[in-house]
Amino acid sequence: MKTYRPVFGTIAILMISLALTAQGDAQEKIKIEYSSVDASNAVWYTAQDLGFFKKNGLDSQLIFIPSTTTAVSSIIAGDIPVGNASGGGVASAAVGGASLVMVGCALNTLPYELVVQQSIKSPEDLKGKSIGISRVGSASDVAARALIKGLGLEPVKDVPILQVGGAPERASAFRGGRIAGFPSPPGIIQLAQGMPHRVLISTADFHKRFEFPYICATTTKPYLSAHRDTVKRVLMALIESTHYFKTHKEESKKIIGKYSRQSNPAYLEDSYTAVAKLYDRVPLVTREGTEVQIKEAVARKTNATLRYEDIADDSIVRELEKSGFIDKVYK
């Protein structure tokens, strides 16, 4: 009997080891959405590309939906459990009865610039001419209105806003003269070869940071209630991804290039630089920016009421900060 004890002991240890390995390797399948290939959404695809979701126990399928309004519809329908959405889209859906909640925002401002025809040199030149956006309530819509106001003009009244579609459609409408300009993320102008243009104003020109819940992990209230730990792991992955992006410039530029399918050095440099400094270390949901979006959404819906607490719950982020998780990531 003594001869077999070591063997049995070894087998027991092996079985325990295999069981622990199986538990450690167990990955929860989840669909996660991102809404743009530009650098502002890099926190999402960097987390996927470098395995931060996997590190936090998620077998993630990253799905590209190039519109906040469409993405919001997918989250509401339950097709996407957690995804990126901006505060404007969430507020607009919420006043319509949707049970949506932003649980954390990596980017709480809107890094956009207003690209216009080269002949437009002043706000007065822009008056009466149309600006193109993707859809009402989208980030491009919010950016267009903020930039127009920044010029001292009134959106719609002084400068008509047209829904023309995504970035390719806006570029086509601009080239064809249907619109006089369009709001654009930083760096895109470097790709506008053959299109005479200028940047008339940028949110970076504003005297005060433009508060806006832009890149926000969003889900439904029922999903958050039933799968709080899953949402927590998504946020942990995004926090780790944000840290990597802010501290690994050249590697991050390559990832932007991979997802945007661009190799233009000036574009990669400008887009990375603009976004890296704006990503928040602690991804809380800006109250000031959210309340502005609530005000605008409520104004478009008769008898609608909405509060910050109705569409924002960053309690998980606060828990992660209090636990020391974020400090540990940034050591």
Located regions from the model:
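Bacterial N-terminal signal peptides that target proteins for export
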Residues: 1-11
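Bacterial N-terminal signal peptides
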Residues: 9-19
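Sec/Tat signal peptide C-region and signal peptidase I cleavage site
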Residues: 20-26
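Short, glycine-/small- and polar/acidic-enriched structural segments
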Residues: 26-166, 170-176, 180-186, 196-203, ...
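Periplasmic-binding protein-like
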Residues: 34, 106-116, 197-224, 235, ...
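Pocket-lining segment of extracytoplasmic ligand-binding domains
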Residues: 88-89, 168-260
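Secondary-structure end/capping motifs
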Residues: 225-305
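Conserved C-terminal helix/tail region of periplasmic/extracytoplasmic solute-binding proteins
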Residues: 295-331
